[in-house]
Swiss-Prot record:
Keyword list, A-Z: Ribonucleoprotein, Ribosomal protein, RNA-binding, rRNA-binding
Name of the protein: Large ribosomal subunit protein uL22
One Gene Ontology term from the biological process aspect of the record: translation
PROSITE patterns: RIBOSOMAL_L22 (PS00464)
NCBIfam families tied to this protein: rplV_bact
Organism domain of life: Bacteria
InterPro entries named among the record's database cross-references: Ribosomal_uL22, Ribosomal_uL22_bac/chlpt-type, Ribosomal_uL22_bac/org-type, Ribosomal_uL22_CS, Ribosomal_uL22_sf
Source organism (scientific name): Leptospira borgpetersenii serovar Hardjo-bovis (strain JB197)
GO MF terms held by the record: rRNA binding; structural constituent of ribosome
Family (UniProt): Belongs to the universal ribosomal protein uL22 family.
GO cellular component: cytosolic large ribosomal subunit
SUPFAM superfamilies: Ribosomal protein L22
HAMAP family (alphabetical): Ribosomal_uL22_B
Length: 110
């Protein structure tokens, strides 16, 4: 049985989220949450929320599922749209600031 959760338009660069996502791929849910607890990155907050959401989705799909037996089968981070902003610079010019968004997908299996 598989359970899936998606967080879209997360206001964080996909490259930075992938660094943390690669660390927890293949681990059991409890073990992955422990790893995230001791990781000092900003990306742990949305990743933790998505993993807990996928775990809750699994319990809705099957009442008898034990969250300790679930493991992260797939976790991937895709690029979302890029918000373009301008920052004033010297001599009347402007520099483009690209604020990147991420889509995080987690698939759990037992």
């Amino acid at each position: 049985m598989e359970a899936k959760a998606v967080a879209r338009f997360v206001r964080m660069s996909p490259r930075k989220v992938r660094l943390v996502a690669d660390e927890i791929r293949g681990y059991a849910v409890g073990e992955a949450l422990d790893i995230l607890k001791f990781t000092n990155k900003r990306a742990i907050e949305p990743l933790t929320k998505v993993i807990l959401s996928a775990s809750a989705n699994a319990s809705v799909l099957n009442d008898k599922v034990d969250s300790n037996q679930l493991f992260i089968k797939k976790i991937y981070v895709d690029e979302g749209p890029i918000m373009k902003r301008f920052r004033p610079r010297a001599r009347g010019r402007a520099a483009r600031i690209r604020k990147r968004l991420s889509h995080i997908t987690v698939v759990l299996s037992d």
